Amino acid sequence: MGLPWYRVHTVVLNDPGRLIAVHLMHTSLVSGWAGSMAFYELALFDPSDPILNPMWRQGMFVLPFMTRIGITQSWSNWSISGDSVVNPGIWSYEGVAASHIILSGLLFMAAIWHWVYWDLELFIDKRTMFPVLDLPKIFGIHLLLSGILCFGFGAFHVTGLFGPGIWVSDPYGLTGKVQQISPAWGADGFDPFNPGGVASHHIAAGILGIIAGLFHLSVRPSQRLYDALKMGNIETVLSSSIAAVFWAAFVVAGTMWYGSAATPIELFGPTRYQWDQGYFQQEIERRVQANIDNGNSIDKAWSLIPEKLAFYDYIGNNPAKGGLFRVGAMNSGDGIAVGWLGHPIFKDKLGNELFVRRMPTFFETFPVLLVDENGIVKADIPFRRAESKYSIEQVGVSATFYGGELNNATFTDPATVKKYARRAQLGEIFEFDRTTLKSDGVFRSSPRAWFTFGHLIFALLFFFGHIWHGARTLFRQVFAGIDPDLDEQIEFGTFLKLGDTSTRRQSV
């Protein structure tokens, strides 16, 4: 037929059998990719250190999504939670991956069958003997089935009635585990960080979908509405489907980037706003002060800070820090975190405490400034030493570590103090292994940023696709120059198929 690449989809116009075939093949490809990608990630994933080397530092993309809906165990006898593993069966990382690949194969064969046996009696209207799809009825069927699935996920899987529950954690990402969730039916259910809203919203949306599906199965649209919205044209279905997809993509891009109960930081990494607002820094300071108030010494107070919490307070884990087009996992940048060196407290020669000003997210370099409790600069690393007034040497700055591997160690050598002052710009100070992965020292982004970027781009493209196909289907007669008074009962284009001489052009 010699179709250009952007017109090839016309071969399934008014061809219900092959329309089903291409959708089966598409689903097969998606399912096959998901299963294959899961196996690929499992081959690379190192589960040995969930605190300093979590899945999001290793660049895992599909594993966090599997984990958040209750999969925590592997056939290789490891568990995300560190618990003992006893025959996890199909509800494991490998089990789910294999299930997707098997499903992909079945869908592949089904697609081939429907492509070969496209001319089924099922698609022929007995009254007209023409192939037909009752699109309003199909819409009702899809609404009903998706409503049942949505309701079932919220009412059974999330609540643990028949399923494991979902991943739930505290606000600081320290105690995450899979647990059963009770639906939140009050105003608190609208809090995006309340996991109870995940259950209640799926239940409510599922019930709404079931009711809407039954409505569209039992109530036919009026002729005027049917014609106005071109309900007999498959391109109408394409346009409205694209609208649903781009809207969903915009929503999940927002919940991922800004954070929500469905995107826990233990699985996807922190958000950039937690660095910008000093979220973890403030919690660490609060805990240290509480420990001191309870009678602990300052070194003991810092030693009680969880290493996991300290690691979140490091700019290298900021998803906006890595740049979108730097290939590789976070570990390929600054390396694999080995241990927390501790929290450095800087003081001048008079004993006044100084604080290193932290680097903002979008700076690649930033002056090293040490300020007092009032925010006044008292020391720095000067650009031009000849004009320096506040250099580390002149002010006599020392650094003492509390907590971590350098607990109670004090450094007065200016070169060493400068080194730790520079590193303190980036948050808590950690030791990294840059040899194992040949890490290059350039920050990488986390799966949180990749997911957000990808879904925003696709949402934008699909938005234009919705406008394009919506305009084509609503104004097809206008674009084609067809007489608006044509007395054909179906709109032009329903039976328009290239090379099909039986397509009706006028009323019988």
From Swiss-Prot:
> What InterPro entries does UniProt report for this protein, alphabetically?
PS_antenna-like, PS_II_antenna-like_sf, PSII_PsbB
Main localization of the protein?
plastid
Molecular function as annotated in GO? chlorophyll binding; electron transporter, transferring electrons within the cyclic electron transport pathway of photosynthesis activity
Keyword set includes Secreted: no
TM ranges = 21-36, 101-115, 140-156, 203-218, 237-252, 457-472
Q: One biological-process term from Gene Ontology?
A: photosynthetic electron transport in photosystem II
**Gene3D superfamilies, per the entry:** Photosystem II CP47 reaction center protein
Q: Which keywords does the record carry?
A: Chlorophyll, Chloroplast, Chromophore, Membrane, Photosynthesis, Photosystem II, Plastid, Thylakoid, Transmembrane, Transmembrane helix
Q: Does the keyword Oxidoreductase apply?
A: no
Q: Which family does it belong to?
A: Belongs to the PsbB/PsbC family. PsbB subfamily.
Its annotated function is as follows: One of the components of the core complex of photosystem II (PSII). It binds chlorophyll and helps catalyze the primary light-induced photochemical processes of PSII. PSII is a light-driven water:plastoquinone oxidoreductase, using light energy to abstract electrons from H(2)O, generating O(2) and a proton gradient subsequently used for ATP formation.
In Swiss-Prot or TrEMBL terms, this protein is called Photosystem II CP47 reaction center protein
Organism annotation: Bigelowiella natans (Pedinomonas minutissima)
